[in-house]
Amino acid sequence: MASRPDTDDYLNLFLNDVPLMDVRAPVEFAKGSFPSAENAPLMNDEERHRVGICYKEKGQDKAIELGHQLVSGDIKAQRIEAWKRFVAQHPEGYLFCFRGGLRSRLTQQWIRDSGIDYPLVKGGYKALRRFLIDSLEAQIESGQFRILSGRTGTGKTRVLMQLPNPVDLEGLANHRGSSFGRQVTPQPSQIDFENRLGVAMLKARHQAGGPIYLEDESRLIGRCALPETLRARMSESPLLILEQAMEERIAIIRADYVEGMLASYRARDGEDAGWLNFRDYLLSAIDRIRKRLGGERYQKLRNLMLQALDQQEANGSLEGHHGWIEALLTDYYDPMYDYQLTQKQGEILVRGGPEVITEWARSRTST
């Protein structure tokens, strides 16, 4: 393999999803890494913990000595094999540790001893993260945003992805943004979410260009928090208001939150367990907004939901779900959205259905 130099071209790494081998410990990786990174640690969590204590008590030289003792023999051979597999699968990639220092150099040397030259990222995770955060803040400050808004169930995410330069905040957070919004797979950590957002914004700026379209979101998407600076820009940015008839909204919610979520739970957990977990998902979602609904309204909606679930389990019919969906939209989500819309500072550019919104945006890609 021809030797490649180490790199500090962070923009290229992120724009091109260059594979990255993160040699930090699993606990560090779990707190946050990058979309194109895989964890292939030099030390496991326990080894890192022991070396860290040694460093504090006895200094760097003794810590390095202990590290070599802990990662030796078969353990060392297994780690090197894991790195070699990554290199074979991703010859165009790079490796990194926290600061681009000792762990990166040692990993690089051990791979080189096996006859392979593999470059590292200068400055490591810390430099990559700083580059992303600085780039994101600069783009939030100077970028042009347009916000796709609309009542719950209008299918905003579907329409967003048909617009010229979208960034899907809910996709990045792996959450649909309401009490019913969780997915069967977990959300990313806050740091992972911020890193994903930073990469998505870089691509929107450098690869597509023009105004960036975002879906209207509150501060929290599930447990992932939007940067306050982005929320402030979104609140004053121009709006596109997506409108749909009630029957269409009910159909969209049923497709996404009933049929889609049941299919996802069954794909993950099997037929019977999937049904039970789907049932728990719907009921826990209504339970989470119990206080905001008020006791009487909550009980009415929960009873409608239970009847719909019983009917679906008995004969597969989805018709019963229309009752609680329509009541939830009419009595809870619509009044809340209508109030929030009055608080918006941005100019309303266009109102209408999906075709109106997409045609308006596409006809103005150069403005």
Swiss-Prot record:
Keywords of the record: Selenium, Transferase
Gene3D superfamilies reported in the protein's UniProt record: Rhodanese-like domain (3.40.250.10)
Species annotation: Marinobacter nauticus (strain ATCC 700491 / DSM 11845 / VT8)
Name of the featured protein: tRNA 2-selenouridine synthase
Catalytic center residues: 97 (s-selanylcysteine intermediate)
Residues annotated as domain Rhodanese: 14-137
InterPro entries (UniProt xref): Rhodanese-like_dom, Rhodanese-like_dom_sf, SelU
Lineage: Bacteria, Pseudomonadati, Pseudomonadota, Gammaproteobacteria, Pseudomonadales
Catalytically driven reaction(s): 5-methylaminomethyl-2-thiouridine(34) in tRNA + selenophosphate + (2E)-geranyl diphosphate + H2O + H(+) = 5-methylaminomethyl-2-selenouridine(34) in tRNA + (2E)-thiogeraniol + phosphate + diphosphate; 5-methylaminomethyl-2-thiouridine(34) in tRNA + (2E)-geranyl diphosphate = 5-methylaminomethyl-S-(2E)-geranyl-thiouridine(34) in tRNA + diphosphate; 5-methylaminomethyl-S-(2E)-geranyl-thiouridine(34) in tRNA + selenophosphate + H(+) = 5-methylaminomethyl-2-(Se-phospho)selenouridine(34) in tRNA + (2E)-thiogeraniol; 5-methylaminomethyl-2-(Se-phospho)selenouridine(34) in tRNA + H2O = 5-methylaminomethyl-2-selenouridine(34) in tRNA + phosphate
GO BP of this protein: tRNA wobble uridine modification
Membership in a protein family: Belongs to the SelU family.
Assembly and binders: Monomer.
Biological function: Involved in the post-transcriptional modification of the uridine at the wobble position (U34) of tRNA(Lys), tRNA(Glu) and tRNA(Gln). Catalyzes the conversion of 2-thiouridine (S2U-RNA) to 2-selenouridine (Se2U-RNA). Acts in a two-step process involving geranylation of 2-thiouridine (S2U) to S-geranyl-2-thiouridine (geS2U) and subsequent selenation of the latter derivative to 2-selenouridine (Se2U) in the tRNA chain.
Single GO MF descriptor: transferase activity, transferring alkyl or aryl (other than methyl) groups
Top-rank EC class of the record's enzyme: transferase
EC number: 2.9.1.3
